[in-house]
Regions:
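Pyridoxal 5′-phosphate
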Residues: 5-8, 12-367
Length: 367
């Protein structure tokens, strides 16, 4: 209803006019900040910065923090499981400043040992950027252990929570990270919405990311006085409608209860895992000990993932096919492309069974 009302009122700018509609837009928009704070269990509302999604959030961290603090031969630690959004921005620093990227592999089952990450820490390590849950393997990473050890050593930590925040309860204070990025479209919200948690003490060391209206207090011919966070990192007319819709979606998920969602999905994942692993002609990528509701797979033989996906689509089953924006992981596993089925709290065991029937049809048609 909030989303529809905002659309109907011509989407007036927030933080601009003094008239009723503008003030209403501002109130509705800013209310979402407290919703995200509650969802992530951040200590301060001001630690929530709105973005267009996880990609912008991580780039904000790269441009506004990392490019101000990292120099030649400084190190960034990444896992091989990272999404391109948590890889490419760090390559920018490698290309422009000579920063070194150190990679940590997962094991054959898709597990990522936090100690393997910690063992790569050195006096030159300035940042560890790690996924909370692999968007390909479903591996749930012990980011708390990694982030707490990083803090002891003065290393900044960034967590890509795009996948994990959908499936489990997140507490950024408990994790101990400095950045935690999420995206709205995976959380039942509109595309083009998202947020990044930035710890207050880190915000104080950051320069603005994008220049324009709202991120300033005043502008002169010879200087600019920047606004305080979080406005300092939110320039121009924001995605007002998208952000309000994002807030509505988060309230909906919290009304169900993230612990309830995690419990339901754990049972569904176990059911799907038993069924899929029972197909000896189906190759499942990664079988980590702690896994979210994500399964990447190929068929035995030469069947291409795109063909499998097309056949499943004809049966009313939507899967993704390709490299899933995780090229380094796919190269590491020696796979050109795979299909990925992702389950959520609105899926059922009957739909898992339908996937199995679709896979059997694909096998018959492509063998």
């Amino acid at each position: 209803a909030s989303y529809r009302r905002q659309r109907q009122m011509c989407i007036r700018d927030s933080h601009r006019g003094l008239h009723y509609l503008s003030n209403l837009a501002t109130d509705n928009y800013e209310n979402v900040r407290s919703i995200v704070q509650k969802f992530l269990r951040a200590e301060h509302e001001e630690e929530i910065v709105f973005t267009s999604g996880t990609t912008e959030g991580i780039n904000l961290a790269a441009y506004a923090w990392a490019m101000e603090h990292l120099k030649n031969d400084d190190e960034i630690i990444l896992s091989i499981m990272e999404h391109h959004a948590n890889i490419v921005p760090w390559h920018f620093l490698r290309e422009r400043f000579g920063v070194k990227i150190k990679w940590v592999d997962c094991d054959a089952s898709g597990n990522l040992d936090p100690q393997a990450i910690i063992d790569q820490f050195s006096d030159k390590t300035k940042l560890v950027a790690i996924t909370h849950m692999s968007n390909v393997l479903g591996t749930v990473v012990d980011v708390k252990t990694i982030c707490h050890e990083a803090r002891k050593r003065g290393i900044v930590s960034l967590v890509d929570g795009s996948q994990a925040a959908v499936h489990m309860s997140v507490n950024v204070k408990d994790i101990g990270c400095d950045f935690y990025a999420i995206t709205g479209h995976k959380l039942c919200g509109p595309s083009g919405s998202g947020a990044i948690y930035i710890k207050q003490e880190i915000q104080k060391t950051m320069r603005p990311f994008i220049g324009g209206g709202d991120m300033i207090k005043d502008v002169f011919t010879d200087k600019v006085i920047y606004n305080d966070p979080p406005m300092k990192f939110e320039a121009g007319t924001p995605g007002i409608v998208q952000t309000i819709g994002f807030g509505v979606a988060l309230e909906y998920m919290m009304s169900i209860g993230m612990d309830n969602i995690e419990m339901y999905e754990s049972e569904l994942t176990l059911y799907a895992r038993q069924k899929l692993e029972g197909l000896n002609w189906l190759n499942i990528q990664g079988k980590p000990s702690k896994k979210g509701a994500i399964f990447a797979f190929t068929l035995e033989g030469s069947a291409h993932a795109h063909d499998i996906s097309t056949i499943l689509d004809k049966q009313g089953i939507a899967v993704r096919a390709g490299q899933h924006c995780a090229g380094p992981l796919m190269h590491h596993m020696g796979i050109n492309a795979s299909c990925r089925a992702s389950f959520a709290f609105y899926n059922t065991k009957q739909e898992v069974d339908k996937l199995l029937s679709g896979l059997e049809l694909a096998r018959d048609l492509l063998s």
